[in-house]
């Protein structure tokens, strides 16, 4: 066998070895991708658009791992001309997270007819529910729904939004208008006692900032602490 023949044999062996490596590489890449796909959390999103209301728009995205994202836009308050875009992340309690996904399942993940279709009803905002997971991506637009599960979800998300909007206003007032905190916290405490708010712990950071701020009057600081310690009534039932 000549030197040239030996070189050809060695080249052929190297090519065969290279070909053997490709299936292993493909398997490795597949295994590295599959876990990330499998662990992507499911999500439920609620959004509401209501011109000339406060806020005019908001959306809440809740993931099956409990992570949640809220964003809104509109006036800081009904009697203010200041407009603000706001967004924040927070963690839901296990009970509320489980309730949201349980109600989404009862509503067939919003895949069927959700809106009542009654055109005589007053417009209360353009609402949308979206469900996403590895197998589904379904949504429904509605003004009013007769489905009990959708009604409960709507009330729960609106209670969540009310809590987050208190957080938005308190953040603004604490920085720019501290005298407005007294009335704002009074309203928040009253609504929490009535069960109109959900997940008060989501705004605990700003409540703590107010309580820790010695430049804020004591009655306001005391009310902020009381709200932090409250166990609100279940919302959305």
Give names to the regions the model predicted.
Residues 37-52, 113-237:
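Short, well-ordered, aromatic-rich surface patches in folded extracellular/luminal domains
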Residues 23-33:
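Bacterial N-terminal signal peptides
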Residues 3-24:
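Bacterial N-terminal signal peptides that target proteins for export
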Residues 65, 91-99, 131-137:
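A short, structured loop/turn motif at beta-sheet edges
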Residues 72-112:
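A short-motif feature that recognizes glycine-rich, charge-decorated loops
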Residues 68-82, 158-169:
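A short, surface-exposed interaction/processing loop segment used at functional sites
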Residues 48-72:
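N-terminal targeting signals for Sec/Tat export/insertion, comprising classic cleavable signal peptides
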Residues 41-43, 55-57, 63-65, 95, ...:
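Extracytoplasmic
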């Amino acid at each position: 066998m000549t030197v040239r023949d030996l070189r050809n044999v060695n080249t052929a062996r190297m090519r065969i070895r290279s070909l053997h490596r490709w299936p292993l590489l493909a398997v490795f890449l597949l295994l590295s991708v599959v876990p990330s796909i499998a662990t992507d959390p499911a999500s439920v999103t609620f959004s509401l658009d209501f011109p000339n209301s406060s806020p005019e728009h908001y959306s809440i995205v809740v993931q099956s791992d409990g992570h949640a994202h809220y964003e809104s836009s509109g006036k800081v308050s009904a009697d203010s001309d200041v407009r603000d875009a706001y967004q924040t992340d927070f963690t839901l309690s296990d009970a509320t997270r489980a309730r949201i996904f349980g109600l989404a399942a009862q509503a067939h993940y919003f895949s069927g007819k959700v809106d009542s279709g009654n055109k005589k009803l007053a417009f209360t905002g353009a609402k949308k529910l979206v469900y996403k997971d590895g197998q589904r991506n379904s949504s429904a637009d509605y003004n009013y729904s007769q489905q009990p599960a959708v009604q409960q979800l709507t009330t729960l998300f609106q209670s969540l939004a009310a809590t987050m909007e208190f957080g938005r206003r308190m953040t603004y007032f604490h920085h720019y208008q501290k005298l407005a905190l007294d009335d704002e916290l009074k309203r928040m405490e009253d609504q929490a006692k009535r069960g109109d708010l959900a997940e008060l712990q989501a705004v605990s950071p700003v409540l703590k900032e107010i309580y820790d701020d010695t430049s804020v009057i004591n009655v306001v600081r005391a009310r902020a602490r009381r709200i932090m310690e409250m166990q609100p009534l279940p919302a959305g039932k």
